[in-house]
């Protein structure tokens, strides 16, 4: 058994007082391992900043892609959002020969994100200058790229949050989940700031380099995040043939559940619609360049982080 090195009592007291989410750590889940696990949310946040903070404006303004196609492409990642319940259930009951449940799904999502981001810039450039007779092929490629990224984000997030709940003690789970979503906001802030710097002098070649660099960072961050996070089980799980449908019927039997799901779905759709037009509005009406419109997503995420901090302080006073 390896000896564990723990900081002295005075350092632990300072960490609990000044380090964000230090109280989410536990002896079984140290702070270093917890922050390392949260890196998958950092990669998801960076990818979201690229999709809704930069590419929507670049496609409409610089590449002259029709706005309806941009709206459809950016909305495609949300297609897989309703499937997160099924993804979570399948990871709960995954009959892995390696004794792992969450890691295979997180790695599958990482590969989908990488593949979608790798082909995305070429599909976008093809949309901007389509050859006669090949437009439908380019549109299928662009839709496939956005679908892969969206599916990868949903699968990675669902399995990752389930893994965080698995490794965290019951009394620490609310703080661990809050840390995961805070790390996603950090990813949005960092990604938007990096995009505003890298695309200050926009060119199609620079766009290809930035998007593919984002694909590489997704793989690296998720690889570090997943490393030795899930303990292997010696026996394989067993999946019931109609287990998910049975669980879904039980969920729908709850009072007002359908109304709740419709409210969440419509609210999410309304919130996503403004993301599509906000950056193009800044470009065409306010005359902002790619760097400044990308920075607007950074400021939005900073305000969201401030809102979470204020809510936490108010709840702690009660």
Regions found by a protein language model. Give the residues of each.
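C-terminal membrane-cytosol helix-exit motif in multi-pass small-molecule transporters
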Residues: 215-234
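Single conserved hydrophobic/aromatic residue that forms the stacking wall/gate
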Residues: 297-318
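Pair of pore-lining "gating" transmembrane helices in MFS-fold secondary transporters
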Residues: 22-60, 147, 253-274
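Central cavity-lining transmembrane alpha-helices of secondary-active solute carriers
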Residues: 70-94, 114-115, 301
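Short amphipathic helix-loop junctions that connect adjacent transmembrane helices
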Residues: 53-69, 276-293
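Glycine-rich segments within core transmembrane alpha-helices of 12-TM secondary carriers
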Residues: 77-84, 113, 174-199
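Transmembrane alpha-helix termini and helix-breaking/packing motifs in multi-pass membrane transporters
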Residues: 93, 125-126, 188-207
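Juxtamembrane intracellular "pre-TM" segments in multi-pass secondary transporters
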Residues: 3-30, 232-262, 285
């Amino acid at each position: 058994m390896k000896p564990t090195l723990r900081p002295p009592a005075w350092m632990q007291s300072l960490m609990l007082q000044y380090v964000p989410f230090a109280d989410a750590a536990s002896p079984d889940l140290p702070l270093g391992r917890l922050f390392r696990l949260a890196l998958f949310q950092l990669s998801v946040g960076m990818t979201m900043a690229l999709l809704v903070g930069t590419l929507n404006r670049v496609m409409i303004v610089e590449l002259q892609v029709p706005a309806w196609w941009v709206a459809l492409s950016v909305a495609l990642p949300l297609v897989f959002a309703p499937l997160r319940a099924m993804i979570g259930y399948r990871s709960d009951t995954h009959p892995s020969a390696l004794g792992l449940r969450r890691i295979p799904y997180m790695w599958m999502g990482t590969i989908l994100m990488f593949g979608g981001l790798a082909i995305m810039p070429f599909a976008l450039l093809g949309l901007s200058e389509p050859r006669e007779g090949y437009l439908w092929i380019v549109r299928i490629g662009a839709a496939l790229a956005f679908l892969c990224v969206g599916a990868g984000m949903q699968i990675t997030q669902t399995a990752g949050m389930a893994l965080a709940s698995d490794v965290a003690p019951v009394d620490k789970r609310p703080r661990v989940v809050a840390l995961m979503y805070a790390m996603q906001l950090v990813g949005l802030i960092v990604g938007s700031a990096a995009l505003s710097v890298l695309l200050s002098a926009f060119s199609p070649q620079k766009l290809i380099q930035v998007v593919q660099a984002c694909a590489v960072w997704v793989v690296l961050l998720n690889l570090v995040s997943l490393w030795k996070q899930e303990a292997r089980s010696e026996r394989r799980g067993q999946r019931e043939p109609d287990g998910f449908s049975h669980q879904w019927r039980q969920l729908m039997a709850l009072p007002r559940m359908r109304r709740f799901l419709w409210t969440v779905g419509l609210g999410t759709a309304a919130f996503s619609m403004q993301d599509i037009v906000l950056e193009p509005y800044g470009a065409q009406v306010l005359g902002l360049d790619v760097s400044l419109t990308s920075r607007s997503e950074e400021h939005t995420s900073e305000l969201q982080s401030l809102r979470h901090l204020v809510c936490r302080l108010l709840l702690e006073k009660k």
